[in-house]
């Protein structure tokens, strides 16, 4: 009995090698294997600041439960931030971001100019023309705004001529920015480098990513502050720096509440 069992068991495994590792054709079958290179995700700007990084701390954490998919750190499209649902669709968000960057750059320059003109006036550079607050009224009047106090230099007599010059100059610059030209080829119309970046600020990609975020944030601030300058000028009849100086001199009396009850502008 024992011998027959032994013979049975030995004949069962006779001549078969035990496989330790299966061959690759058995694992994959005869299908083709393709290897795909996934594009590396751009590294967020590694600044020490928690506000300008890609994983920015959401300031309105209480209001917004979940950030939308399109929201980056720069364009926070949370429920609180985009009240008008302007960034609901991804395409609209991209267009709005483009408009925000372009308008923000303009506003940053404009706010600097508005403050600079008032600063120059305060520093006793005898500018005959009014500050930004009253400039529009002065240009529309017949007497014209003499910007550098000399009538022969920049002597804006016709508002239409000013407008025409602005259209030509800005049209030329924008045309170069979109279509390219002698200044260099267009790589990215929103952030054109080359002659538009004389300081070479966008050479390093990490610094460039951080500067983009700072540009949008500071640009929003500048647009809002420019709006504030206009409201201040309408209500108080003074420029932003004069208002600031008055407020610092006497913060209790010279502030927004002093003008809140005054509904006749400029008085």
Swiss-Prot record:
Domain of life assignment: Eukaryota
Key words, A-Z: Chlorophyll, Chloroplast, Chromophore, Magnesium, Membrane, Metal-binding, Phosphoprotein, Photosynthesis, Photosystem I, Photosystem II, Plastid, Thylakoid, Transit peptide, Transmembrane, Transmembrane helix
Binding, chlorophyll a 5: 214, 232
Lipoprotein recorded as keyword: no
PTM per Swiss-Prot/TrEMBL: Photoregulated by reversible phosphorylation of its threonine residues.
Similarity comment: Belongs to the light-harvesting chlorophyll a/b-binding (LHC) protein family.
Self-association and partners: The LHC complex consists of chlorophyll a-b binding proteins.
Record-linked PANTHER family: CHLOROPHYLL A/B BINDING PROTEIN (PTHR21649)
Function: The light-harvesting complex (LHC) functions as a light receptor, it captures and delivers excitation energy to photosystems with which it is closely associated.
Domain remark in the UniProt entry: The N-terminus of the protein extends into the stroma where it is involved with adhesion of granal membranes and post-translational modifications; both are believed to mediate the distribution of excitation energy between photosystems I and II.
Protein name: Chlorophyll a-b binding protein 3A, chloroplastic
Species, as recorded: Solanum lycopersicum (Tomato)
